[in-house]
């Protein structure tokens, strides 16, 4: 009688992603609905309803934040993540009358979100009043 143990069942080796991996960062119900439609099988989804913590975001080729309007804190946190990891990032915001996509931030090649926001305000942009933001959120 043999006392050797049988080999463990063969497990399939983890597969490398077939293309670029996107980290989707949704904030709110609208964002989660959008991300459900956009995310591919290799992409990761990390909800940021309570803030963006970079250690919770796995490494990816790019990041997309989908959020309510004027989430400057989230956008600045995304900038920090983008520049620290050297990955492009994009923001998508739902306003009452429009859907705003951008800016695309490419570390070392384009302006950061803070610079974009400062320039936008210089030309007359005003954030939504707090009561409108509260009604949307």
Task: Give the location of each predicted region.
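Adenine nucleotide-associated cytosolic modules
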Residues: 1-137
């Amino acid at each position: 009688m043999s006392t050797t143990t049988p080999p463990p069942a063969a497990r399939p080796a983890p597969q490398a992603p077939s293309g670029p991996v996107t980290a989707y960062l949704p904030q709110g119900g609208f964002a989660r609905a959008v991300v459900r439609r956009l995310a591919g099988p290799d992409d990761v989804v990390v909800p940021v309803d309570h803030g963006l913590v970079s250690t919770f975001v796995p490494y990816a080729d790019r990041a997309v934040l989908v959020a309510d309007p004027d989430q400057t804190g989230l956008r600045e946190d995304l900038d920090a993540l983008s520049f620290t990891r050297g990955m492009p990032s994009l923001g998508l915001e739902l306003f009452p009358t429009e859907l705003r996509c951008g800016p695309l931030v490419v570390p070392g090649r384009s302006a950061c979100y803070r610079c974009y926001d400062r320039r936008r305000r210089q030309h007359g942009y005003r954030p939504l009043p707090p009561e409108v933001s509260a009604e949307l959120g």
